[in-house]
Amino acid sequence: MIKKSAAILAGGKSSRMNYRNKAFLKYEEDYFIERIIKALEDYEEIIIISNNPGEYKEFGLKVFKDIYPGQGPLSGIHSALNHIKNDYCLVVACDMPFINKDVVNYLGNIKEDYEILIPKFQERLQPLCAIYKKSCKDIMEKELINNSNKLIKTCFKFSMKVVEEFPFIEKVHKKEIKNFYNINTVDEYEDLIKKKEI
């Protein structure tokens, strides 16, 4: 058991997805959110952040709303950090159907000498599959109050540990390499369903 919390950001309906809730898109018979919950099962606590908590009753998890709604993923992370019981929280977006248990467990077991542990994949930081220290919530709140809600910009206000290598990644199924892929548009989702791979 990983003595950290995990939070799934299920912000709601996306305009680029024709206002469908991406958490309830299906891939291989499971909702995206079901696949993510399974990947996070070794974390001591799993919560969901959503402004529509009634939609998630079937999963038996605690659901919390944004404290500062309408300000994007930074608001969701801030809410998660205010509600978790542990000192660290893995944050995952609900539109990442290939989140892999080995990858998130590897992140969860890295020594806690950081405020933010953030993967870098294909030259891009991945703040929506990253671990945040609970104490980050105070600076995040100041940013939200000032309507300065850019997530990456806010991340640079903290001591970040960047993870660029996953030692096991070449030895396992290629789905691990897709871990950070997210589905944003109707076309991307239709392509996913047609090809069954990315």
From Swiss-Prot:
Cofactor(s) required, per the database record: Mg(2+)
Keyword Ion transport: no
Source species taxonomy: Bacteria, Bacillati, Bacillota, Clostridia, Eubacteriales
Domains (record comment): The N-terminal domain determines nucleotide recognition and specific binding, while the C-terminal domain determines the specific binding to the target protein.
Binding sites annotated in the UniProt record for GTP: L9, A10, G11, K22, D66, D95
Family: Belongs to the MobA family.
Highest taxon of source: Bacteria
Nuclease among keywords: no
Pfam families cross-referenced by the UniProt entry: NTP_transf_3
Enzyme Commission identifier(s): 2.7.7.77
Entry GO terms, CC: cytoplasm
Record key words, sorted: Cytoplasm, GTP-binding, Magnesium, Metal-binding, Molybdenum cofactor biosynthesis, Nucleotide-binding, Transferase
Single GO MF annotation: molybdenum cofactor guanylyltransferase activity
Organism whose genome encodes this protein: Clostridium perfringens (strain ATCC 13124 / DSM 756 / JCM 1290 / NCIMB 6125 / NCTC 8237 / Type A)
Cell location: Cytoplasm
InterPro entries, per database record: MobA-like_NTP_Trfase (IPR025877), Molybde_CF_guanTrfase (IPR013482), Nucleotide-diphossugar_trans (IPR029044)
Catalytic reactions of this protein: Mo-molybdopterin + GTP + H(+) = Mo-molybdopterin guanine dinucleotide + diphosphate
Protein's name in the database: Probable molybdenum cofactor guanylyltransferase
